From Swiss-Prot:
Homodimer. It is an enzyme of class 2 (transferase). Belongs to the purine/pyrimidine phosphoribosyltransferase family. PyrE subfamily. It catalyses: orotidine 5'-phosphate + diphosphate = orotate + 5-phospho-alpha-D-ribose 1-diphosphate. This is Orotate phosphoribosyltransferase. The gene is pyrE. One of its GO terms (molecular function) is magnesium ion binding. It comes from Acidithiobacillus ferrooxidans (strain ATCC 53993 / BNL-5-31). The keyword Signal does not apply. 5-phospho-alpha-D-ribose 1-diphosphate binds at residues 117-125.
Length: 195
């Protein structure tokens, strides 16, 4: 999939939103990518995730035996990437504020894992998911996302990162947000903090 095709799919599904948003990272932005609107269509989810894993070098891809993504946003992404790779898919959840594998999910010692996300901004959720994988005995081989909106600022502790699309989107700390300065109030469309 080309960058233009990914953006077109997000636009077609009403998933590329403009306004004043409070992101899961705590940053503010005038653009929000609501991946759930794209992932609600199985064909779109399958196409995006197959393209994600196709971007991982063959030698690395062959070593992946499990895909893990943080709930909520990456549950479907993990599943579809696992299906595209022919491996199982797990997800992490918050327990006492920390990402962990629950529901009886286990990783074999040293099992090769691909950690996935729908969107990365600071990479915080991805790093938390990676820590949960490591704590469970897995080996993080790489990370991937449908869209990296970090402008290259995401760092995954040396693990290679293979986003399908790099999309520079403006973000601000709350104190520096021009939309807040103009009297606007951000909306929080993401899933972090939901109970």
């Amino acid at each position: 999939m080309t960058a233009d095709e990914v953006v077109a799919l997000y636009k077609e599904d009403g998933a590329l939103l403009h306004g004043h948003f409070l992101l899961s990272s705590g940053l503010h932005s005038d653009t929000y990518l609501q991946s759930a609107r794209v992932l609600q269509y199985p064909g779109h989810a399958a196409r995006l995730c197959a393209a994600m894993v196709a971007g991982i070098p063959d030698d690395l891809r062959r070593r992946i035996s499990c895909v893990v993504g943080p709930a909520m946003g990456a549950v479907l992404v993990s599943y579809e990437c696992g299906r595209a790779l022919g491996v199982r898919s797990l997800f992490t959840e918050r327990e006492a504020g920390q990402m962990v594998l629950r529901r009886g999910f286990v990783l074999a010692p040293g099992e090769g894992v691909l950690v996935v996300e729908d969107i990365t901004t600071t990479g915080g959720s991805t790093r938390e998911c990676m820590a949960a994988v490591t704590a469970a005995g897995g080996q993080v081989l790489a990370a991937s996302a449908i869209i990296d909106r970090s402008s290259g600022f995401s760092d995954f502790d040396g693990a290679p990162f293979f986003p399908l699309l790099k999309l520079p989107v403006l973000t601000w700390e709350a104190a520096a947000c021009p939309l807040c300065a103009a009297g606007g109030t951000p909306v929080k469309p993401g899933s972090r903090g939901l109970s």
